[in-house]
């Protein structure tokens, strides 16, 4: 069983955008969709998209959106590699979930340790959250507790 899988096309990204919980951080926006929250009342097209994601048998699915405003290709790729490494390292803690991360400009100046602490704290907060649609963080999360 593959441990980490990425979202492949626009339809999968749109499915997560429409149905996921949101977490707002000053350097990124995190969308999280648990498999258990998927309802059978979704339209047939959305059910097919979800089934195609689920059929890839990964514990954690990850989508990354890094716009050109962030920097040149080497900077965007560096950010994507860092986020994938953090997710791959910790995917055993988060099962049957889809995370989608939309990166903001402030992430460029962030070093790997700070990025890891902020992402993991956000992952944990979202994964353990009640069913709220939007969660906001007004200050930077200082360190990962766990």
UniProtKB/Swiss-Prot annotation:
Its EC number is 3.1.26.5. Keywords: Endonuclease, Hydrolase, Nuclease, RNA-binding, tRNA processing. Pfam families: Ribonuclease_P (PF00825). It is an enzyme of class 3 (hydrolase). Gene3D superfamilies: 3.30.230.10. GO terms for molecular function: 3'-tRNA processing endoribonuclease activity; ribonuclease P activity; tRNA binding. Consists of a catalytic RNA component (M1 or rnpB) and a protein subunit. RNaseP catalyzes the removal of the 5'-leader sequence from pre-tRNA to produce the mature 5'-terminus. It can also cleave other RNA substrates such as 4.5S RNA. The protein component plays an auxiliary but essential role in vivo by binding to the 5'-leader sequence and broadening the substrate specificity of the ribozyme. This is Ribonuclease P protein component. It comes from Helicobacter hepaticus (strain ATCC 51449 / 3B1). The gene is rnpA.
């Amino acid at each position: 069983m593959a441990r980490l899988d990425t979202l492949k096309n626009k339809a999968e990204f749109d499915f997560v955008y429409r149905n996921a919980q949101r977490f707002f951080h000053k350097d990124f926006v995190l969308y999280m969709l648990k498999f258990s929250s998927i309802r059978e009342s979704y339209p047939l097209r959305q059910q097919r998209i979800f089934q195609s994601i689920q059929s890839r048998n990964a514990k954690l699915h990850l989508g990354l959106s890094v716009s050109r405003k962030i920097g040149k290709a080497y900077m965007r790729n560096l950010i994507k590699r860092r986020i994938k490494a953090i997710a791959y390292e910790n995917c055993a803690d988060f099962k049957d979930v889809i995370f989608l991360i939309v990166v903001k400009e402030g992430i460029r100046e962030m070093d790997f340790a700070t990025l890891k602490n902020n992402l993991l704290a956000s992952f944990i907060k979202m994964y353990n959250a009640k069913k709220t649609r939007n969660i906001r963080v007004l200050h930077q999360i200082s360190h990962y507790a766990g």
